[in-house]
A protein has these predicted regions:
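Divalent-cation-coordinating short motifs within acidic/hydroxyl- or histidine-rich contexts, strongest
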Residues: 17-18
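Acidic, Ser/Thr- and proline-rich intrinsically disordered linker/docking segments
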Residues: 2-14, 23-32, 36-170
Length: 170
């Protein structure tokens, strides 16, 4: 879904990439990266088919380099743990072209973005996460779950992009 008109490549600038989970059905969740640009956000969905294709591509790369099993396994884990970083250098059209589910939303189409963060547990075993709900001016709401903890820098980034439309709760 494309809610905006194309812009020149010079206006692109990724502010931050957030990792989230999107619930498709009762037992089906997929990873979704929220790529925050200066003028819009882009949702990049990692569907099972897309993940399988990316894993196959990386496996072929690892095999072609002659890397052994253990180093290859470590390389594959590293690939997926830093996968979100690739979006820091991609343009919105390139992200949208990856998967038909991907969508871009200009900030002026967002009536409210609710970011709720929590931290549980003690020093040794704490967990963090929360909700990221994007309410659109057409009445639709995109509901995501995230694993980010409260961060003043994140709050500041979201505040600078969304202003009064941001509801940040910890």
């Amino acid at each position: 879904v494309n809610y905006s008109t194309p812009q020149t490549h010079a206006s692109y600038g990724v502010v931050r990439v957030l990792t989230a989970q999107k619930k498709l059905s009762m037992f089906n969740m997929i990873t979704c990266y929220v790529v925050l640009f200066n003028d819009r956000l882009v949702l990049a969905h990692i569907t099972p088919e897309f993940q399988k294709a990316e894993s196959a591509r990386k496996s072929a790369e690892i095999r072609a380099s002659g890397t052994g099993f253990f180093k290859g396994s470590a390389e594959m884990m590293r690939f997926w743990s830093y996968y979100h970083k690739k979006y820091e250098t991609m343009s919105p059209p390139a992200i949208l072209a990856e998967c038909p589910m991907n969508m871009e939303i200009p900030y002026n189409m967002i009536s409210q973005l609710l970011f709720r963060a929590y931290e549980e547990g003690d020093e040794d075993s704490s967990s963090s996460g929360g909700d990221l709900n994007i309410s659109l001016s057409n009445g639709n709401v995109i509901k995501l779950k995230h694993k980010h903890d409260h961060s003043k820098a994140l709050n500041n980034d979201l505040q600078s992009l969304l202003g009064f439309r941001l509801k940040y709760k910890k």
